[in-house]
Swiss-Prot record:
Residues 536-807 form the Protein kinase domain. Belongs to the protein kinase superfamily. Tyr protein kinase family. AXL/UFO subfamily. It is found in: Cell membrane. Residues 27-128, 139-222 form the Ig-like C2-type domain. Coiled coil: none annotated. The active site is at 672 (proton acceptor). This is Tyrosine-protein kinase receptor UFO.
């Protein structure tokens, strides 16, 4: 009889031969009513995470049945089982050997129990003998203590929970590595009540069972000061409030300072509703303690405020107190009334004035008027809230050199008096003026000189109106035709003059939006984004590339002229959907508000005769120090190299991480993060730029794959190169390359590796190597950004925090007396392998002391690279080899 193995796909040949050999010795003629099982499941006992296999074997006659697995009497529907069938004869009606295996991966408590095999033969059901799976090992933690902050001497609870088997599991708590009990308790103490701490401590718990001991993570409990108490007002001034408070306990850590915040009550309505933070930026002051008292200045008089205080120790700040409503008192007006006029008409003197332009510092209650003649005492009047008064002249006597002064007053007192305003001198024998308030006559009594003034004003206004209408009419013609056609006869011919320079397209923003054919909803959002094109004046070109140019410009605003950077695009928008996407993104970018993110000033369009839609023009703030890559490059390779300390480089990295953290919280993906797309403002802070609307204007760093648009392959993440998928994690990859650029002072990544070879180079596991003089911690952070799995890369929040901590740990930067760049390995350098300084480790450098003991080496470069030394006389350019750095402005073209 010939034996054959069925086609079982993945069944090993050795296993098949073993079954066939067993079948040759197996007894024949098994009774149908007898159990067909010839092998039953065994027992498995192990620790958590163990991998094991259960097996049962049966011999049947005829078509082999399907074997089911039971756990505690229940069929396992999703069991990881395999079934192998081996015939014992050539006929399908002969006996079969059936082997079923159940694989248990990563043993857990839920996998324990009684296991059996189940088969159905005809109308009978057969169940194998049981096998048992048990779990025994070290205790496993279900809950561990967590880090937290608590106020000094404030009770709190910690939780810890573990399980076996084997049971029981006893817990032992430790504080600062010292057990809180001499031995484990009689039962698991899952919750630990701590009555209070006066210093920062660490807590952990140990779980004990028959197999051994497992220790939980260590939780750090940071002790912060208690919330200050009894915040109250000590004294009030119109622009100052003096407040005091009682400090809370701070444990063994003395308070270093307290912070007081004040916010306007009118703008902080949410405060009264219990909001923990004010809706606007509060006015903040710090005070060294003791004493626990602070004078808060620069406030508005007669204004309600809410104030709160928090105190800080070396461990951190306390919680804020509840908001306390306070109000500054009224003050006197800061200035006198304006535009005082004093005129006489017959027997009446008219005095008129306007409200003070200076702040009133309270509620205006009225005005006081004082007048005095040369030989008469001063007369003081309370006018109330009126802004004019009539003095009736009557009686006998004489008055000369009469002057009038006016002052405003509030509940706090009188403000400053105005300068004396003289009345026309009265002739002797004329009546002496005595004051009385009279009602304004129903018909104003004007003298003849007033009529002349009124008539002259009407005539002047009419002339101005006629001239304006004429100029508007003439301007319409010039705008439409360039210049009015003026027929003049010269030698019998008609001459037409045309002035092109006086023809402008001054369409308003409304007209521009209407001409684009976009939706009304988008049009409404664009009111604050669009800028009239004629308000932008272009200057010199700052940079130009394949897709457009960046030019210096000026934006004419209502009351000033703003220096801006203007990006013009050579690629026009072809469809209305592209136009709406462009404008929608502009609306989104206009709302960005972060010190490390380049903000968008506005967008305008310039018409094109060859395109159906106008070309976009992006208006951005002008950055004094230009882009970060050029700054780094010139600091290393310029005519006068500049020393950049490590502290400044880490600050650049932290600024970029902060800006990208903000963009990622806005769910905004940059897609082109690099040093060339980061700008330096006048404060040497880095702003992330060239995202969204900014078409790329650089050439060398972009590689076109087929018809796909150019991509910056040396900065782009590996998954984006493969699938064109961009996420915030792909921006993290680009940030790591940008960190490498900063650490190398502007070198090009992967020198010697072509753009078309980058993907294969990365797929082989290659990454940028650690630059010279780069901190190990910084390079470790870069390497985390280049993890193959995007989920393993850090977030921008983690990157920012790590960089800020690194910056704090560095010593203060020190400027060297003189920085000299030299070639540290003269005479026969080693050829650089592909990716040198970014693909392979540089060769060993000789000791700088052996070359020149009087030089201060600022950087050590790989062999064969040219560097610059300060020189008072110009020297001829040296020939650059393949390993030498590119000239400024060319190094990007990898």
């Amino acid at each position: 009889m010939a034996w054959r193995c069925p086609r079982m796909g993945r069944v090993p040949l050795a296993w098949c031969l073993a079954l066939c050999g067993w079948a040759c010795m197996a007894p024949r003629g098994t009774q149908a009513e007898e159990s067909p099982f010839v092998g039953n499941p065994g027992n498995i006992t192990g620790a958590r995470g163990l991998t094991g296999t259960l097996r049962c074997q049966l011999q049947v006659q005829g078509e082999p049945p399907e074997v089911h697995w039971l756990r505690d009497g229940q069929i396992l529907e999703l069991a990881d089982s395999t079934q192998t069938q081996v015939p014992l004869g050539e006929d399908e009606q002969d006996d079969w050997i059936v082997v079923s295996q159940l694989r248990i991966t990563s043993l857990q408590l839920s996998d324990t129990g009684q296991y059996q095999c189940l088969v159905f033969l005809g109308h009978q059901t057969f169940v194998s003998q049981p096998g048992y799976v048990g779990l025994e090992g070290l205790p496993y933690f279900l809950e561990e203590p967590e880090d937290r902050t608590v106020a000094a001497n404030t009770p709190f609870n910690l939780s810890c929970q573990a399980q076996g088997p084997p049971e029981p599991v006893d817990l032992l708590w430790l504080q600062d590595a010292v057990p809180l009990a001499t031995a484990p308790g009689h039962g698991p103490q899952r919750s630990l009540h701590v009555p209070g701490l006066n210093k920062t401590s660490s807590f952990s718990c140990e779980a004990h069972n028959a197999k051994g001991v497992t220790t939980s993570r260590t939780a750090t409990i940071t002790v912060l000061p208690q919330q200050p108490r009894n915040l109250h007002l000590v004294s009030r001034q119109p622009t100052e409030l003096e407040v005091a408070w009682t400090p809370g306990l701070s444990g063994i850590y003395p308070l270093t300072h307290c912070t007081l915040q004040a916010v306007l009550s009118d703008d902080g309505m949410g405060i009264q509703a219990g909001e923990p933070d004010p809706p606007e930026e509060p006015l903040t002051s710090q005070a060294s303690v003791p004493p626990h008292q602070l004078r808060l200045g620069s406030l508005h008089p007669h204004t309600p405020y809410h104030i709160r205080v928090a105190c800080t120790s070396s461990q951190g700040p306390s919680s804020w107190t509840h908001w306390l409503p306070v109000e500054t008192p009224e003050g006197v007006p800061l200035g006198p009334p304006e535009n005082i006029s004093a005129t006489r008409n017959g027997s009446q003197a008219f005095v008129h004035w306007q409200e003070p332009r200076a702040p009133l510092q309270g509620t205006l209650l009225g005005y006081r008027l004082a007048y005095q003649g040369q030989d008469t005492p001063e007369v003081l009047m309370d006018i109330g809230l009126r802004q004019e008064v009539t003095l009736e002249l009557q009686g006998d006597g004489s008055v000369s050199n009469l002057t009038v002064c006016v002052a405003a007053y509030t509940a706090a007192g009188d403000g400053p008096w105005s300068l004396p305003v003289p009345l026309e001198a009265w002739r002797p024998g004329q009546a002496q003026p005595v004051h009385q308030l009279v009602k304004e006559p129903s018909t104003p009594a004007f003298s003849w000189p007033w009529w002349y003034v009124l008539l002259g004003a009407v005539v002047a206004a009419a002339c101005v109106l006629i001239l304006a209408l004429f100029l508007v009419h003439r301007r319409k013609k010039e705008t439409r035709y360039g210049e009015v056609f003026e027929p003049t006869v010269e030698r019998g011919e008609l001459v037409v003059r045309y002035r092109v320079r006086k023809s402008y397209s001054r369409r308003t923003t409304e007209a521009t939006l209407n001409s684009l054919g976009i939706s009304e909803e988008l049009k409404e959002k664009l009111r604050d984004v669009m800028v009239d094109r004629h308000k932008v004046a272009l200057g010199k070109t700052l940079g130009e590339g394949e897709f457009g140019a960046v030019m210096e410009g000026q934006l004419n605003q209502d009351d000033s002229i703003l220096k801006v950077a203007v990006k013009t695009m050579k690629i026009a928008i072809c469809t209305r959907s592209e136009l709406e996407d462009f404008l929608s993104e502009a609306v989104c970018m206009k709302e960005f508000d972060h010190p490390n993110v380049m903000r968008l000033i506005g967008v305008c369009f310039q018409g094109s005769e060859r395109e159906s839609f106008p070309a976009p023009v992006v208006i951005l703030p002008f950055m004094k120090h230009g882009d970060l890559h050029s700054f780094l490059l010139y600091s290393r390779l310029g005519d006068q190299p500049v020393y950049l300390p490590t502290q400044m480089l880490v600050k650049f990295m932290a600024d970029i991480a902060s800006g990208m953290e903000y963009l990622s919280t806005k769910r905004f993906i940059h897609r082109d993060l690099a040093a060339r797309n980061c700008m330096l403002n006048e404060n040497m802070s880095v702003c992330v730029a060239d995202f969204g609307l900014s078409k790329k204007i650089y050439n060398g760093d972009y590689y076109r794959q087929g018809r796909i648009a150019k991509m910056p392959v040396k900065w782009i993440a590996i998954e984006s190169l493969a699938d064109r998928v961009y996420t915030s994690k792909s921006d993290v990859w680009s940030f790591g390359v940008t960190m490498w650029e900063i650490a190398t002072r502007g070198q090009t990544p992967y020198p010697g590796v072509e753009n078309s070879e980058i993907y294969d180079y990365l797929r082989q596991g290659n990454r940028l190597k650690q630059p010279a003089d780069c901190l190990d911690g910084l390079y470790a952070l870069m390497s985390r950004c280049w993890e193959l799995n995007p989920q393993d890369r850090p977030s921008f929040t983690e990157l920012r925090e790590d960089l800020e901590n690194t910056l704090k740990a560095l010593p203060p930067a020190q400027e060297p007396d003189e920085i000299l760049y030299v070639n540290m390995d003269e005479g026969g350098g080693y050829p650089e392998p592909p990716g040198a300084a970014g693909g392979a480790d540089p060769p060993t450098q000789p000791d700088p002391k052996d070359s020149c003991s009087c030089l201060t080496a600022a950087e050590v470069h790989p062999a064969g690279r040219y560097v610059l030394c300060p020189s008072t006389t110009p020297s001829p350019a040296q020939p650059a080899d393949r390993g030498s750095p590119a000239a400024p402005g060319q190094e990007d073209g990898a």
